[in-house]
Amino acid sequence: MKTLSPAVITLLWRQDAAEFYFSRLSHLPWAMLLHSGYADHPYSRFDIVVAEPICTLTTFGKETVVSESEKRTTTTDDPLQVLQQVLDRADIRPTHNEDLPFQGGALGLFGYDLGRRFESLPEIAEQDIVLPDMAVGIYDWALIVDHQRHTVSLLSHNDVNARRAWLESQQFSPQEDFTLTSDWQSNMTREQYGEKFRQVQEYLHSGDCYQVNLAQRFHATYSGDEWQAFLQLNQANRAPFSAFLRLEQGAILSLSPERFILCDNSEIQTRPIKGTLPRLPDPQEDSKQAVKLANSAKDRAENLMIVDLMRNDIGRVAVAGSVKVPELFVVEPFPAVHHLVSTITAQLPEQLHASDLLRAAFPGGSITGAPKVRAMEIIDELEPQRRNAWCGSIGYLSFCGNMDTSITIRTLTAINGQIFCSAGGGIVADSQEEAEYQETFDKVNRILKQLEK
C-alpha cells in the first residue's frame, strides 16, 4: 500500500476560489463541488472541487456499473462493498492531514433509495426520476479551499503541475440564465396530506412506530443553467453542507444544513437535526422563537428518539463503549429557520472502513423516523414517489480513511427540464396536522421563492 501523500501546490487565495474554478467545470459530467456556504458555522471550513474522475460507480436498483477508462463492469454485489474494493484497488493510503480532509478518493451521491440494498423494503412508491441510487466518482486530484487558514490547495496523486495547467486552461462559457417556466406544484393536495397524516397517526397509536417523517414534493419546469441557480441559492442560504453535482443524467443542488456522519482519523461524529421553527424578522421575537424551540417538549422528544436511533446505528460498528452524546438539544440559527441539533460521537475500530460505518447508519434516522425500517416501510406506502437523491447523502470517502457526508435535505434535483424539491417533518403521537403541514413550507419556501425571481 502506497502511503505517499499527494503532491500539493498552493494557489492564490480568494474567498470565492471554489466557485471561480468550478464555474469553468460546472458543465462537465462528474464535476462536483462540496461547499461550506460561507456560513457562520463551526463546520463551514472547507470547500472541495473535483472533476474528471479516474473511475465512476453508478447504481440503478440491483446493478452497479464500474467504469474505468474503456472498461465497464456490472455487478449485483453490495454497492458500498464494491466502492470499498475500488478504493482498496487504488492502493493509495496517505497519512491523515487535518488541513486536507479529502486527499483524493470517492466523492458523490448516495441517494435515499440506496437504502433498499441494505434493508428489505416494499416497492409501492413510483420511481419517476431516472437518476442513479448511487453516483460516485473516484478522483486522484482535488482543489481544497480552507476558509479558516485562507488557503487554496491543489492536490494530485499524478502530475500536479499538469493538473494546474488543465484547471487554468478551462474556459468559462456563458450559459443561459436559469428560469422557472411554470409555477411550483405539490405532489399532494392539502386534503391528501391530511389523509396521510391521519394514517401515520393510526400507525403511531397502534404502537407500530413512534415517529415517521412524512414529506410532500414540489415540482416545476425550467430552462437554463442549473449552476446559475445554485450560485443564487448558495449565496442566500448559507448552508454549511451545500453541494452541486453534475451527473450524466442531470444536476443535484443541495443547500443542506445537516451533517450526516463525519469520520476524521477514526473519530466519528453525527449531528441529527430534529425540531424546526421559522426565523422572525424582529430580533427580540426571533430570540423568543429560539427559546421556544429549545423548551419544546415535543421537539425534544422527537430529537431524543433520533439520537437514540443514531446511537444504536453507530453502535453497530463503533468501538464498544465509545458512543457518547456531548451535545443534546442545541438551537442553531439558519437564514430561514431555527433547528434543534444534537451531537453523537464514537470511535471507529481499526479493522473497519468508513464505508462500513456509512452502511450501518444509512439512510440517516433524522429523515426516516423510528424504528427506522418500519418508518421507511410506511414512507414507501404513503409518499407517492420515491425520494431518490432527497434524504440520502452527499459526501466523500477519502483515500486517507476520512469521510464526511451530509443529509440531502433542502436539496433540488434537476433533470430533463424538470426540477424537484421535497420537504417533510417528523410526526409523533402528539403532532398537530396543521403545524406539521406548515413546517414543510417553512423549510423550503425560501428556496422555492428565490428561484421564482
Swiss-Prot record:
Description of the deletion phenotype: Cells lacking this gene do not produce 4-aminobenzoate.
Residues reported to bind L-tryptophan: 36, 43-46, 240-242
Cofactor: Mg(2+)
GO BP terms in the entry: 4-aminobenzoate biosynthetic process; folic acid biosynthetic process; L-tryptophan biosynthetic process; tetrahydrofolate biosynthetic process
A family per Pfam: Chorismate_bind
Known outcome of mutating residue 258 to D: The reaction is extremely slow
Pathway(s) the chain acts in: Cofactor biosynthesis; tetrahydrofolate biosynthesis; 4-aminobenzoate from chorismate: step 1/2
Keyword Magnesium: yes
Entry coiled-coil feature ranges: none
Enzymatic class: transferase
One function term, GO molecular function aspect: magnesium ion binding
Positions of disulphide bridges: none
Regulation acting on activity, per entry: Inhibited by 6-diazo-5-oxo-L-norleucine (DON). The inhibition is competitive with glutamine but uncompetitive with chorismate. Also inhibited by 2-fluorochorismate.
GO CC, alphabetical: aminodeoxychorismate synthase complex
EC number(s) given by UniProt: 2.6.1.85
InterPro entries per record: ADC_synth_comp_1 (IPR005802), ADC_synthase (IPR005801), Anth_synth_I-like (IPR019999), Anth_synth_I_N (IPR006805), Chorismate_C (IPR015890)
Resulting phenotype, residue 274 to R: Absence of covalent intermediate
NCBIfam families hit by this protein: pabB, PRK15465.1
Note: In this enzymatic reaction the C4 hydroxy group of chorismate is replaced by addition of a nucleophile at the C2 position. The nucleophile is the epsilon-amino group of lysine 274 transiently binds to C2 of chorismate. PabB contains a tryptophan (Trp) molecule deeply embedded in a binding pocket. Trp which cannot be dissociated without denaturation of PabB, may play a structural role in the enzyme since it has no effect on the enzymic synthesis of aminodeoxychorismate.
Family indicated by similarity: Belongs to the anthranilate synthase component I family.
Function (record text): Part of a heterodimeric complex that catalyzes the two-step biosynthesis of 4-amino-4-deoxychorismate (ADC), a precursor of p-aminobenzoate (PABA) and tetrahydrofolate. In the first step, a glutamine amidotransferase (PabA) generates ammonia as a substrate that, along with chorismate, is used in the second step, catalyzed by aminodeoxychorismate synthase (PabB) to produce ADC. PabB, in the absence of PabA, can catalyze the formation of ADC in the presence of exogenous ammonia.
Cross-referenced PANTHER family: AMINOBENZOATE/ANTHRANILATE SYNTHASE, AMINODEOXYCHORISMATE SYNTHASE COMPONENT 1
The protein's assembly and partners: Monomer. Heterodimer consisting of two non-identical subunits: a glutamine amidotransferase subunit (PabA) and a aminodeoxychorismate synthase subunit (PabB).
Protein name: Aminodeoxychorismate synthase component 1
Organism placement in taxonomy: Bacteria, Pseudomonadati, Pseudomonadota, Gammaproteobacteria, Enterobacterales
Gene that produces this protein: pabB
